Design a protein with these regions (language model features):
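Electron-transfer interface patches adjacent to heme c in soluble/periplasmic c-type cytochromes
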Residues: 1-9, 30-38, 126-165
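Extended intrinsically disordered, low-complexity coil regions enriched in Ser, Thr, Gly, Ala
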Residues: 4-7, 17-24, 116-121, 152-155, ...
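The canonical Cys-X-X-Cys-His
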Residues: 8, 43, 102, 106-116
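Detector for the c-type heme attachment site
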Residues: 13-16, 48-49, 112-118, 161, ...
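Hydrophobic or amphipathic alpha-helical targeting/insertion segments
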Residues: 40-47
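Extended, well-folded interaction surfaces typified by the phenylalanyl-tRNA synthetase beta subunit core
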Residues: 55-71
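Electrostatic cytochrome c docking/interface patches
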Residues: 75-104, 145, 150
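Extended amphipathic alpha-helical interaction segments
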Residues: 84-88, 101, 111-121
């Protein structure tokens, strides 16, 4: 509740806390970097005016060396954080563009469904092709036959609304 809207936007899209410390990419700011100013403003307004304030100290971050060195996140961000908006795709429909924005930005689907590299960066060339997330497997959600390519629009809508699709999928883990 003590963040200004600018500080909130920087945390959300750049991974920088109000005190200037770097966030770890467990906070999916790499995906949120694609969010529009209007959506960031709407989130800020909701959190500040629509969610009751709770005094709760965050537990200390406990990571092994060298991941526990927050200053290293500056280098990680220089290598892997793209602060540019999603590239234009003038040949695509408004529905496709909105879907890309939701999947790659606000909903951050790739955060779990994209394999990670040695430095825990998303392997963009394998975007949304499925990945291990702790004890869970986030499956391939590309249009490939091994993903959701054979699903109908109705099935996809049902799954996103309910988290299950009889005979095909059941949401689990952090989904």
């Amino acid at each position: 509740g003590n963040y200004t809207e600018r500080q909130f936007a920087d945390a959300l899209r750049k991974g920088i806390r109000a005190d200037g410390q770097r966030l770890y990419p467990a906070m999916p700011y790499v995906s949120y970097a694609a969010m529009t100013d209007a959506d960031v403003h709407a989130l800020y307004a909701y959190f500040m005016q629509g969610v009751p304030a709770v005094e709760q100290a965050a537990p200390p971050t406990e990571l092994p060396f060298p991941m526990n060195v927050r200053a290293s996140m500056k280098l990680w961000n220089a290598l892997f954080l793209d602060e540019q908006p999603l590239p234009p795709a003038p040949d695509r429909s408004p529905q496709w563009l909105r879907g890309r924005y939701l999947a790659e930005g606000a909903a951050h689907c790739g955060t779990c469904h994209t394999p990670r590299g040695f430095l825990m960066q998303e392997k963009k060339e394998l975007n949304m092709s499925g990945a291990q997330v702790g004890p869970w497997y986030a499956p391939n959600i590309t249009p490939h036959a091994t993903g959701i390519g054979a699903w109908s629009e109705t099935e996809l809508v049902q799954y996103l609304r309910t988290g299950r699709l009889e005979g095909k999928a059941q949401a689990a883990g952090s989904m």
